[in-house]
């Protein structure tokens, strides 16, 4: 019985029916079992398990049954096909009759029926004890059900915001790429999800050294300003998630997309309604460790995250770029899309799914989503270009909220993806296929005073505030201007006032009054004029240096040119526009053409530049301080002529300068020797091989006690830079307590002297100049109001500037007239030394005229010095005779003879 049961079970399998051993067509001895075989058959559509069942169960049973069974082909073969009505009647119960219409099963119904039949056969097999559970069907069913179950668990975990252990167990070792490249690995679903969760966890849990949540504060600040950029420090990411930091430079496009999605989820978890402001959050990577030069970018940098720096030379306007585009079918008006537009290629539909037509299609303007697009060009910084090389440049693309983050003239640090794209013009020019390269910007950081103000620490602010309370802070700052240049105290004072600047005004919003102080240096060759300009370029937070010979009118202001590719007119900025909110330094100012010099009239007074060229009518800001250096006519300054006669400049230009500094190269044996000692000592101290003075940079060391050092210690150059930045940004002095009558009287006196001597004209601009200098002096002391000391210093600087431009014949009389103003904040010893030098010069002239030669020792009666000193209210000269200043200038006092001696 067991044998017959076994043979029946095997015969009813699909494999045997395919071999022709179907029990329905077998011998009459087995025909009685046809009904049972039909009811127990698993179905006609079962998958074949021929090889698998034979491999698992073996083939001994069926082979023995076939050998021992009856012969089907033989003499009695016809009897098997005779009609037997009783046995040929099928059971109608549960079966569909042949004459009935049977509906075709769907795929899901067929799969359900097959699953039910497999379950039935499995239970029947277990009941007979012949198959172990899961031998044939369970393994397949589990293989099919497990991905579905895991997929449902993943979706549930993603929706609930919970991390599923089973979901990430297969990619716990994320750095194991399993033979894939980084780009392929991070594009897979499993690693993408793991990176997504790790970065989200990093944003939620990263704290600084003080235990504060870093990104909670940054996200809060970002949402307050309605921005969509979240800055992530690469060093923080590398310290916490080193695997993500390793993947990021290799596959930046894929990683940044995952980071953006994770950041958006974190932001929406904190501020659920922030999606009304923006649907995208862009993660910006800063402080990438390796900085590449523009000229060092090569093929191996393609599609990698790089960091470089340069100066922005040009930029386009902000243009709309397709982000998610939809198309309309012109034949059936069906809306196709959305299609995600990438940077590398344009996505276009092939055919309409509604009417199957191949077009034409047009962009659906209403439903298409755009993003901001701007193209800039950055050029290598002048200081980083190798000797004998020209600066290289590279195009960069700014998207989203990065547009207008920089302007021409800004020095920036750019982090982005180095891409290549097709450029037809390059192929035409080179004759073979080449690709243009462009940097897709991810993060832009400017290097200007705004960044510097933000970088001032609390310790810096405390140090600056304490310095401002020093009574001699003004003298310290004046002495800190170009400390490696000997003498020229008046020039240093004027440049210091120009660096701090006054306060701009706009009464009623109708007329702008500039606050910048313009300075003109004029004098003999070899008097350090250009060195002063170079020093200002280094110490100023924003400076543009140019020369009169190499600068044209459009080079100083602005010019219009046609873009070589798009053929549209673009506006390019000149030196004055690039120096906005900074200093424009012009050397060899007298070498400029008159037409070029006329173009800066508007920029120096109204501080704007009007352009009307090629259909472009606009006005550009040029709010900068102009410091220029010029040589006199004939090469040397002639003191017997006025300033206007010595310099080839027109009166409109001269009147726009607030401070005029005349530098004369006079022969003075004592001063010449002191200058020579100073220069030699400076060379010795700053020689590269002198290791002892290696830490003293930019000549910020303490110089010997000389008259031009004001007798105080100069400030270090870094401290001076921070002091200037803080004062210009935070201090805005007012004029409420200013002595207006003193300024008015000084203006009337200067006008009268100007008309009498025929020197430079005094205009209303000089009143504004005095006010600006008073505000600058108040800003040096970090005062909120202009006091009398500030006005006196402004008058003194204005008078020195005015008197130095006079003829030598009227200079002495004017110094006597304005002696009480010129003596402000001067040390008595300095005044007495000045008077004594005048007496010595008169004695030298007398001896040359009488004896034809100069003696080694000059004697000046003490009575002459005492009389001169009484005129300026100085009665006690004993302190002057004992001072270091008196001895340094090689003077000695003979008490017996009451004579003052000077050795040459």
Swiss-Prot record:
* Name of the protein: DNA replication licensing factor MCM2
Motif range for Arginine finger?
655-658
According to its UniProt record, this protein's enzyme class is: hydrolase
Report what the Swiss-Prot or TrEMBL entry states about this protein's PTMs: Phosphorylated on Ser-108 by ATR in proliferating cells. Ser-108 proliferation is increased by genotoxic agents. Ser-40 is mediated by the CDC7-DBF4 and CDC7-DBF4B complexes, while Ser-53 phosphorylation is only mediated by the CDC7-DBF4 complex. Phosphorylation by the CDC7-DBF4 complex during G1/S phase is required for the initiation of DNA replication.
Per the UniProt record, the associated disease is: Deafness, autosomal dominant, 70: A form of non-syndromic sensorineural hearing loss. Sensorineural deafness results from damage to the neural receptors of the inner ear, the nerve pathways to the brain, or the area of the brain that receives sound information. DFNA70 is characterized by slowly progressive, postlingual hearing impairment.
Q: Can you say where in the cell this protein is located?
A: Nucleus; Chromosome
What EC numbers are recorded for this enzyme?
A: 3.6.4.12
Region annotation (Interaction with DNJC9) maps to 61-130
Outcome of altering residue 27 to A?
A: Impairs ATPase activity of the MCM-2-7 complex and reduces phosphorylation by the CDC7-DBF4 complex
Q: Which sequence positions carry the modification called Phosphoserine?
A: 12-13, 26-27, 32, 40-41, 53, 108, 139, 381, 484
Q: Where is this region: Interaction with KAT7?
A: 2-257
Statement: the UniProt record of this protein carries the keyword Nucleus: yes
| ZnF region ranges: C4-type | 329-355
Swiss-Prot/TrEMBL catalytic activity: ATP + H2O = ADP + phosphate + H(+)
Q: Which sequence positions carry the modification called N6-acetyllysine?
A: 216
Residue(s) carrying Phosphothreonine: 25, 39, 59
**Compositionally biased region (Basic and acidic residues):** 111-125
What organism is the protein native to? Homo sapiens
Sites where Phosphotyrosine occurs are at: 137
**Keywords, comma-separated and alphabetical:** Acetylation, ATP-binding, Cell cycle, Chromosome, Deafness, Disease variant, DNA replication, DNA-binding, Helicase, Hydrolase, Isopeptide bond, Metal-binding, Non-syndromic deafness, Nucleotide-binding, Nucleus, Phosphoprotein, Ubl conjugation, Zinc, Zinc-finger
What functional role does this protein have? Acts as a component of the MCM2-7 complex (MCM complex) which is the replicative helicase essential for 'once per cell cycle' DNA replication initiation and elongation in eukaryotic cells. Core component of CDC45-MCM-GINS (CMG) helicase, the molecular machine that unwinds template DNA during replication, and around which the replisome is built.
């Amino acid at each position: 019985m067991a044998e017959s049961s076994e043979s029946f079970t095997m015969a009813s399998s699909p494999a045997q029916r395919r071999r022709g051993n179907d029990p329905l067509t077998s011998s009459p001895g087995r025909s009685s079992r046809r009904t049972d075989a039909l009811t127990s058959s698993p179905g006609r559509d079962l998958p074949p398990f021929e090889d698998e069942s034979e491999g698992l169960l073996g083939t001994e049973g069926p082979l023995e049954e076939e050998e021992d069974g009856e012969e089907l082909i033989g003499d009695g073969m016809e009897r098997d096909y005779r009609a037997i009505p009783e046995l040929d009647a099928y059971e109608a119960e549960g079966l569909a009759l042949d004459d009935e219409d049977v509906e075709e099963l769907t795929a899901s119904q067929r799969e359900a029926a097959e699953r039910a039949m497999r379950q039935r056969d499995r239970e029947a097999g277990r009941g007979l004890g012949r198959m172990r559970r899961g031998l044939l069907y369970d393994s397949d069913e589990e293989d099919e059900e497990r991905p579905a179950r895991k997929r449902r668990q993943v979706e549930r975990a993603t929706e609930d915001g919970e991390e599923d252990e089973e979901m990430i167990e297969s990619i716990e070792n994320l750095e194991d790429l399993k033979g894939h490249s980084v780009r392929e690995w991070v594009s897979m679903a499993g690693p993408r999800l793991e990176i997504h969760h790790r970065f989200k966890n990093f944003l939620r849990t990263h704290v600084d050294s003080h235990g504060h949540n870093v990104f909670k504060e940054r996200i809060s600040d970002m949402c307050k300003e309605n921005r969509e950029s979240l800055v992530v420090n690469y060093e923080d990411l590398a310290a916490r998630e080193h695997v993500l930091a390793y993947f990021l430079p290799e596959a930046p496009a894929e990683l940044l997309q995952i980071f953006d999605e994770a950041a958006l989820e974190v932001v929406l978890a904190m501020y659920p309604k922030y999606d009304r402001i923006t649907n995208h959050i862009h993660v910006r990577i800063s402080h990438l460790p390796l900085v590449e030069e523009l000229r060092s970018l090569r093929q191996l940098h393609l599609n990698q995250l790089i960091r470089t720096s340069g100066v922005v030379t040009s930029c386009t306007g902000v243009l709309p770029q397709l982000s998610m585009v939809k198309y309309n079918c012109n034949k059936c008006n069906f809306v196709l899309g959305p299609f995600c537009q990438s940077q590398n290629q344009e996505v276009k539909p092939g055919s309409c799914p509604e009417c199957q037509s191949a077009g034409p299609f047009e962009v659906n303007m209403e439903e298409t989503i755009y993003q901001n697009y701007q193209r800039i060009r950055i050029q290598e910084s002048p200081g980083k270009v190798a000797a004998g090389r020209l600066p290289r440049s590279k195009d960069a693309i700014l998207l989203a909220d990065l547009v207008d983050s920089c302007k021409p003239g800004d020095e920036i640090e750019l982090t982005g993806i180095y891409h290549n794209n097709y450029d037809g013009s390059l192929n035409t020019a080179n004759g073979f296929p080449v690709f243009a390269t462009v940097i897709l910007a991810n993060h832009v950081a400017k290097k200007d005073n705004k960044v510097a103000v933000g970088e001032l620490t609390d310790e810096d602010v405390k140090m600056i505030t304490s310095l401002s309370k020093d009574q001699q802070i003004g003298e310290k700052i004046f002495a800190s201007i170009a400390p490696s240049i000997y003498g020229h105290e008046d020039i240093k004072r004027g440049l210091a006032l120009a660096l701090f600047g006054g306060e701009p005004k706009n009464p009623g919003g109708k007329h702008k009054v500039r606050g910048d102080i313009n300075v003109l240096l004029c004098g003999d060759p070899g008097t350090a004029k250009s060195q002063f300009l170079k020093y200002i370029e280094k110490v100023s937070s924003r400076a543009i240096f140019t020369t009169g010979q190499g600068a044209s009118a459009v080079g100083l202001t602005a010019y219009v040119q046609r873009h070589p590719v798009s053929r549209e007119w673009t506006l390019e900025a000149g030196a004055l526009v690039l120096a906005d909110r900074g200093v424009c330094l012009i050397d060899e100012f007298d070498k400029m053409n008159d037409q070029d010099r006329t173009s800066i009239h508007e920029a120096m007074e109204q501080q704007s530049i009007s352009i009307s060229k090629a259909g472009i009518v606009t006005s550009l800001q040029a709010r900068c301080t102009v410091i220029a250096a010029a040589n006199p006519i004939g090469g040397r300054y002639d003191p017997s002529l006025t300033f206007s006669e010595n310099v080839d400049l027109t009166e409109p230009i001269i009147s726009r300068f607030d401070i005029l500094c005349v530098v004369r190269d006079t022969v003075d044996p004592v001063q010449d020797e002191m200058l020579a000692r100073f220069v030699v000592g400076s060379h010795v101290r700053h020689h590269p091989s002198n290791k002892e003075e290696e830490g003293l940079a930019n000549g910020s060391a303490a110089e010997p006690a000389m008259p031009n050092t004001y007798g105080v210690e100069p400030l270090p150059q870094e401290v001076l830079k921070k002091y200037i930045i803080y004062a210009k940004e935070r201090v805005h002095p007012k004029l409420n307590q200013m002595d207006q009558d003193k300024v008015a009287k000084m203006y009337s006196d200067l006008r009268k002297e100007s008309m009498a001597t025929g020197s430079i004209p005094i205009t209303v601009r000089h009143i504004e100049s005095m006010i600006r200098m008073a505000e600058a002096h108040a800003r040096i002391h970090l005062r909120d109001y202009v006091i009398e000391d500030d006005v006196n210093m402004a008058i003194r600087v204005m008078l020195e500037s005015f008197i130095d431009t006079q003829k030598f014949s009227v200079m002495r009389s004017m110094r006597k007239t304005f002696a009480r103003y010129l003596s402000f904040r001067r040390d008595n010893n300095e005044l007495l030394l000045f008077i004594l030098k005048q007496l010595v010069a008169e004695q030298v002239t007398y001896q040359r005229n009488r004896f034809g030669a100069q003696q080694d020792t000059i004697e000046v009666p003490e009575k002459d010095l005492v009389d001169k000193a009484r005129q300026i209210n100085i009665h006690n000269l004993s302190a002057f005779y004992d001072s270091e200043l008196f001895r340094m200038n090689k003077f000695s006092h003979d008490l017996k003879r009451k004579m003052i001696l000077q050795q040459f």
